[in-house]
Structures are given as structure tokens and as C-alpha cells.
């Protein structure tokens, strides 16, 4: 796999609270230079990124109900709608983990449905926060996402105790089938890890280390 190829898997990410306008402009410039699929940013910076990325192929991804997923569904839906209005084309929402742990699966489903309805053509990714879930909970959540026809299931926020694992990526791919994307995020910081995720079913990589991933491919002549 060449660096150009893997670049189109990457959502180039900056979600921590201290990011400045210049940080976001730098992120956008890097995404343009390296042909990353998107930038993944907090919604307050969408207008800035939209202006910077106009007339480029780089998409804008943002997060909803982030990072806890415990917001009211109406708030998540409103957040998604406003983000899309501002210029986002992809929405990464956090599933309600507490409802999963409470076995309130109908509420979990309704929460996703509310955001999906608000997306109005934008692609929806559902963050499961797999480090907090059992294998059975991951399977059930993926089945709901498959039934609803979301765009992607995603492993992690990157703000909790663990990130993506090869085992969970393979499990998620097995459950959702081939028609839904699988995004690996959290802890994917080097070329070898990214390639392993892709080999096991990931079709998108969320990382703040996109340049390191690309440089690893370049420096090692695509040996992974």
C-alpha cells in the first residue's frame, strides 16, 4: 500500500480543547498537502475549516455528543443539524453508553435514529467506545447500526481508557458486513498499526498522527 492510498483512509483529527485557530488552519493545510480524506474537528471550528478547504477535496467531519454520549437525543440531533448547516459533511456521534449498560436498547436505537434523521444526506458514524463495552454489547450495538443503515461504526472517542484494537475492528466488520464502514480511532499513531486495522476491516482511520502514518510508509518503502 502506497502513502497516497492510505491517505484516503485518514480523518486528520484535532479534537482536544486547547486547539487554536492556527492549529486548525495547520491541520487543514496538512490535509490538503497529504490528500487526507477529511479533517475531524470540533463544530465551533467548522466555519474556519470550510473557508480554508473550499475548492479542495478534503471533507469536514465533526463530532456530536462528544465525548460522553450522554446528551439528550434532541440535543445531539440539533448539534448535528447545525454542524451540517455550517459545512460538515460527516458526523461522528457518540452512542449512549449508559443506556447500553442499562440494557435500554430501544433507547439506544432511538438516539441513533434521531441523529440519523437530522443528518439530511451527511454521513453518520456511530462511536461505540468499545473499551467500555463487552463483546456482546459491541455485537448488539453493531447490529442496531446495521439495521438503521448508518454510514460507519467507529471504535472510540480517543478520550477514554482505550482505543481501537485489531480484535474489535475484526468483530465490528464481521457483524456489520460489507455495506457499512468501520472506523478505527484512538491509539492509531503509526503505519504498522494503521495497516493492521485496514487489513482487519477498517475503511477509515481517525488519527492526529496522519503525517507520521504517511511518513512511515514513505520511509519504509511501503513494506508493511
Curated annotation (Swiss-Prot):
Known pathway: Carbohydrate degradation; 2-deoxy-D-ribose 1-phosphate degradation; D-glyceraldehyde 3-phosphate and acetaldehyde from 2-deoxy-alpha-D-ribose 1-phosphate: step 2/2
Matches recorded under InterPro entries: Aldolase_TIM, DeoC, DeoC/FbaB/LacD_aldolase, DeoC_typeI
Catalytic activity: 2-deoxy-D-ribose 5-phosphate = D-glyceraldehyde 3-phosphate + acetaldehyde
Keyword match Cytoplasm: yes
Active site: 92, 154, 183
Subcellular location: Cytoplasm
The keyword Lipid biosynthesis appears for this protein: no
EC code: 4.1.2.4
Family stated for the protein in its record: Belongs to the DeoC/FbaB aldolase family. DeoC type 1 subfamily.
Protein name: Deoxyribose-phosphate aldolase
Organism: Histophilus somni (strain 2336) (Haemophilus somnus)
Origin organism lineage: Bacteria, Pseudomonadati, Pseudomonadota, Gammaproteobacteria, Pasteurellales
